[in-house]
Amino acid sequence: MPRVKRGVTARARHQKIFALAKGYRGRRKNVYRVAKQAVMKAGQYAYRDRRQRKRQFRQLWIVRINAGTRENGLSYSKFMNGLKRASIEIDRKVLADLAVFDKAAFAQLVEKAKAALAA
């Protein structure tokens, strides 16, 4: 049985890492050992940040809704409670969009929430 030389597989493995490290600065793009570490770390950041992105967008939506409700004389928590009591099921993403781009429609929602809280 002939001995297996690793030239082809090693080169393929290195090329795969270098392709992933394309665009990196310094030795991170052309030294295999450093590039491999950089790609691994990038993968960890990507994994973590895919989860953080969901949290950050929810925070952004809440900030925008809060700003819109305070313009109409209500706090965020009371507004959300009012919507729940009024049986209005609109998610925060859509509410934030309304608060920024359609202030009239958002003001009507705030009035409905106020009415539901008063009742």
Curated annotation (Swiss-Prot):
Pfam families: Ribosomal_L20. CDD domains: Ribosomal_L20. Gene3D superfamilies: 6.10.160.10, Ribosomal protein L20 (1.10.1900.20). It comes from the Bacteria. GO terms for biological process: ribosomal large subunit assembly; translation. GO terms for cellular component: cytosolic large ribosomal subunit. Belongs to the bacterial ribosomal protein bL20 family. This is Large ribosomal subunit protein bL20. It comes from Neisseria meningitidis serogroup B (strain ATCC BAA-335 / MC58). The lineage of its organism: Bacteria, Pseudomonadati, Pseudomonadota, Betaproteobacteria, Neisseriales.
